[in-house]
Amino acid sequence: MADQLSLRLEADQLPDLPDLRPMMARPLPAPFDSDEHLFEPWWGGARALVYVGPADLAGAGDVRVRDATGQEIAAAFPELAGLAVRIAARSAILDGELVVVDGSGRADPVALAGRLAGEPGRPAAFLAFDVLHLDGRSMLSQPLIRRREALRRILRPGDEVVAVPAIATEGVALYAAAVAQGIAGIVARQRSSPYLPGVKSRLWRFVAATPAGGTTLAGGATSDVPPDVLPEADGPAAAPVLALISRLPFDED
């Protein structure tokens, strides 16, 4: 009983999670290689911040999902309600993209747009790439590589959430793979970059995938691209998110 009371007091003493807005990337016309950057796929999903509050004695934590404008959208994605059990922390704010994956393991922007509008459909997943707040401590001033280390440490992947891996240096190769796999593009983030809430910064750049035909592959929802763009999703009930990620040649950062 004493241990349970201690756990409750420890959770109650945590500060309220801050109200943040996503840091945004600026566009570039072409991919590049750089030892100073980490490169990730731009899935074309809906940008979102996931807030995970302290777990109660039953192990269930408060989960809130907010879009890039700060609007609460958790009600549209009940499948994310149990996400707290996959976070090995008392509280956290994660940044990432919501996607819906089709049967071929590709992101489906139309299906995601339907889910955002409250329509029933295939389950969504949250592809996390950053952690902004952890166990009552701000992570905003920490460099990206430290925040990503923390993210990988606390997140246990599952059908509804996964930490997106990155590749070091080889942005051109990742871009070529993204184009070949029909993925929306890539994002380059400076390894040393702090997190600047609500800022569109040159510390982060995105390159939309353009196949030989000349039109971009991104299409229809909202992300950190103009004006907050699209998803890549859809997929079998098994583990569509992991299948999506496995299409690309990642080295751990």
Question: Which residue stretches match the model-derived regions?
Answer:
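Catalytic cores of nucleic-acid ligases and guanylyltransferases
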Residues: 1-253
